[in-house]
Amino acid sequence: MSDINATRLPIWGIGCNPCVGDDVTSVLTRGEA
């Protein structure tokens, strides 16, 4: 669970920037997939 929380924290912080958020989402999606 700690890993999930650690992964979500940066996402919320970066999520403030739509452009960066999209890049992060695509990277995470590819990595998890």
Curated annotation (Swiss-Prot):
Gene name, Swiss-Prot/TrEMBL: AMA
InterPro entries: Amanitin/phalloidin (IPR027582)
Family recorded in the similarity comment: Belongs to the MSDIN fungal toxin family.
Organism of origin: Amanita exitialis
Residues found modified as 4-hydroxyproline: P18
Cross-link (Cyclopeptide (Ile-Pro)): I11-P18
Alphabetical UniProt keywords: Hydroxylation, Thioether bond, Toxin
Gene Ontology molecular function terms on file: toxin activity
Positions of modified residues ((3R,4S)-4-hydroxyisoleucine): I11
Propeptide residue range(s): 1-10, 19-33
NCBIfam families per the UniProt record, alphabetical: amanitin
Role this protein plays: Major toxin belonging to the bicyclic octapeptides amatoxins that acts by binding non-competitively to RNA polymerase II and greatly slowing the elongation of transcripts from target promoters.
Other remarks in the entry: The typical symptoms of amatoxin poisoning are gastro-intestinal distress beginning 6-12 hours after ingestion, a remission phase lasting 12-24 hours, and progressive loss of liver function culminating in death within 3-5 days. One of the few effective treatments is liver transplantation.
Tissue specificity comment: Expressed in basidiocarps.
Name recorded for this polypeptide: Alpha-amanitin proprotein 2
PTM notes: Processed by the macrocyclase-peptidase enzyme POPB to yield a toxic cyclic octapeptide. POPB first removes 10 residues from the N-terminus. Conformational trapping of the remaining peptide forces the enzyme to release this intermediate rather than proceed to macrocyclization. The enzyme rebinds the remaining peptide in a different conformation and catalyzes macrocyclization of the N-terminal 8 residues.
